[in-house]
């Protein structure tokens, strides 16, 4: 069995203050996740606005996450993707050297590699480090799909590639992956289908909603993984509206607005080209979060 990171995982937002990384706020957010039952924190992914962070900021976020989790059972799965393989290797090596327990590596964006190119890209990354590697498939954002045959090949050939975060939005894709390779760890990358993936053999979630409601995402995930599906479904059904609302605009625009409205971040700031939600959607988010018990620090 390959070493893996799984369970209830949070795709962390990155807070800014006066357009600078708000390090103190970021640390507080991570400690809140630890307090409320999350298994793994995932800094500097899509939700963390990694595309508009400087290289130094990216590294600082990884260091803060690792330091915040020291002395706890919570692990750090560091975002370490790039569309330049050499750059992805550099981030992966940094993450390993600074104590991350694994890396999340998004498929190369913009340059649209072939399946063979994807294979070579991920093989090079995996061979450069010892810690676990979770593939990240999100074709709607990056413009390329890591097809199942490529996933199986990487899983077989690379000792530390243990699974995939699936954000295609396709339950069928996840079932296909699990049916053909039962030992592959499939992680839900979309809150709307967390429960269907978990109940079909998925081994965890990387959740946006968990920024706001870590306790409920943790409960849902652990119940489902313990095959207590009826109890898990009750929580999932309760989260239906918030899950939909947090994707009313491009992620992470709504979740940051929700965190601000809940008093969990002091300022509502994004890095352009991301900007604040429309007035209509801001109001919608404000109304929806009133229906949920949001735990504090």
UniProtKB/Swiss-Prot annotation:
Pfam families registered for this protein in UniProt: DHDPS
Reactions mediated catalytically: L-aspartate 4-semialdehyde + pyruvate = (2S,4S)-4-hydroxy-2,3,4,5-tetrahydrodipicolinate + H2O + H(+)
GO biological process: diaminopimelate biosynthetic process; lysine biosynthetic process via diaminopimelate
Active site annotation, chain numbering: 136, 165
Keywords annotated in UniProt: Amino-acid biosynthesis, Cytoplasm, Diaminopimelate biosynthesis, Lyase, Lysine biosynthesis, Schiff base
Compartments it resides in: Cytoplasm
Residues engaged in binding pyruvate: 47, 206
Matching CDD domains: DHDPS
Enzyme nomenclature, EC number: 4.3.3.7
One Gene Ontology term, aspect cellular component: cytosol
Site (Part of a proton relay during catalysis): 46, 110
GO MF, one example: 4-hydroxy-tetrahydrodipicolinate synthase activity
Keyword match Transmembrane: no
Pathway: Amino-acid biosynthesis; L-lysine biosynthesis via DAP pathway; (S)-tetrahydrodipicolinate from L-aspartate: step 3/4
InterPro entries named in the record: Aldolase_TIM, DapA, DapA-like, Schiff_base-form_aldolases_AS
Family (UniProt): Belongs to the DapA family.
Summary of subunit composition and partner proteins: Homotetramer; dimer of dimers.
Known function: Catalyzes the condensation of (S)-aspartate-beta-semialdehyde [(S)-ASA] and pyruvate to 4-hydroxy-tetrahydrodipicolinate (HTPA).
Protein name: 4-hydroxy-tetrahydrodipicolinate synthase
Organism, as annotated: Campylobacter concisus (strain 13826)
């Amino acid at each position: 069995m390959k070493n893996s990171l799984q369970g209830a995982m949070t795709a962390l937002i990155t807070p800014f203050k006066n357009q600078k990384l708000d390090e103190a706020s970021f640390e507080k957010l991570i400690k809140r996740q630890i307090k409320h039952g999350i298994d793994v924190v995932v800094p500097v992914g899509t939700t963390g606005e990694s595309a508009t962070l400087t290289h130094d900021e990216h590294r600082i976020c990884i260091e803060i996450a690792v330091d915040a989790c020291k002395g706890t059972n919570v692990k750090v799965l560091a975002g370490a993707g790039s569309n330049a393989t050499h750059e992805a290797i550099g981030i992966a090596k940094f993450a390993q050297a600074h104590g991350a327990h694994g890396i999340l590596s998004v498929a190369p964006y913009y340059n649209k590699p072939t399946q063979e190119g994807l294979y070579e890209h991920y093989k090079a990354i995996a061979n450069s480090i010892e810690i676990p590697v979770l593939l990240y498939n999100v074709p709607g954002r990056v413009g390329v799909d890591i097809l199942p045959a490529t996933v199986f090949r990487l899983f077989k050939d690379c000792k530390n590639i243990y699974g995939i975060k699936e954000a295609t939005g396709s339950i069928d894709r996840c079932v296909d992956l699990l049916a053909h390779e039962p030992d592959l760890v499939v992680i839900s990358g979309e809150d709307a289908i967390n429960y269907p993936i978990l109940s079909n053999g998925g081994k965890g979630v990387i959740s946006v909603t968990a920024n706001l409601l870590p306790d409920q995402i943790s409960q849902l995930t652990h119940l489902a993984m313990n095959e207590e599906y009826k109890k898990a479904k009750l929580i999932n059904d309760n989260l239906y509206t918030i899950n939909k609302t947090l994707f009313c605009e491009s992620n992470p625009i709504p979740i940051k607005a929700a965190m601000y409205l809940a008093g969990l971040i002091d300022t509502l700031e994004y890095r352009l080209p991301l900007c604040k939600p429309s007035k209509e959607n801001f109001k919608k988010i404000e109304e929806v979060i009133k229906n949920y018990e949001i735990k504090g620090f």
